[in-house]
């Protein structure tokens, strides 16, 4: 057989091709890669976790700030509502007192001779 037809003897194989054993190199290369990956994986996971933790921490702080702001606004709103109720009550009280005073003044005016019409006096002249 010719070299083109394939290898017929071990001599042709040895002279044409160099046999390289890949098993040891592959195992060593794979072990080396696996070792590097295993050593990098915790670092990457820790870095990822740190990034996630930092992001979560920022989000948590923002949520806490917003919750505190909402609670403060709710308390302010409750205080304003209580103040409005107090002002309404005071307004009703003052209206009632004004009506009483108005009625009292009207009664005094009708009973007083100073505020009587002067028709009788003008007829005497």
From Swiss-Prot:
Natural source organism: Mus musculus
Which terms are listed as keywords in the entry? Coiled coil, Cytoplasm, Golgi apparatus, Membrane
Q: Name one GO cellular component term.
A: cytosol
The protein's assembly and partners:
Homodimer. Interacts with ARL1, ARL2 and ARL3. Directly interacts with FEZ1 and UVRAG. The interaction with UVRAG is reduced by amino acid starvation, but the complex is stabilized in the presence of FEZ1. Interacts with NRBF2.
Q: Where is this region: Disordered?
A: 1-31
- Chief location of this protein within or outside the cell: Golgi
Q: What is this protein called?
A: Short coiled-coil protein
Chain segments annotated as coiled-coil in the UniProt record:
43-101
* Family statement: Belongs to the SCOC family.
A GO BP annotation: regulation of protein complex stability
Which subcellular locations apply to this protein? Golgi apparatus membrane; Golgi apparatus, trans-Golgi network; Cytoplasm, Cytosol
Function per UniProt: Positive regulator of amino acid starvation-induced autophagy.
Q: How does it sit in the membrane?
A: Peripheral membrane protein
Instruction: Note the superkingdom of the native organism.
Output: Eukaryota
UniProt keyword annotation of Membrane present: yes
């Amino acid at each position: 057989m010719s070299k083109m037809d394939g290898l017929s003897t071990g001599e042709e194989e040895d002279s044409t091709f160099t046999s390289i054993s890949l098993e040891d190199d592959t195992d060593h290369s794979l072990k080396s890669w696996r070792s590097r990956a295993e050593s990098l994986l915790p670092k990457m996971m820790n870095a990822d976790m740190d990034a996630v933790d930092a992001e979560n921490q920022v989000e948590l702080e923002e949520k806490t700030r917003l919750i505190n702001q909402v609670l403060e606004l709710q308390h302010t709103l409750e205080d304003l509502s209580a103040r409005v109720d107090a002002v309404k009550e005071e307004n009703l009280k003052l209206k009632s007192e004004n009506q009483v005073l108005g009625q009292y003044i009207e009664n005094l005016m009708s009973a007083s001779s100073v505020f009587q019409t002067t028709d009788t006096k003008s007829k005497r002249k």
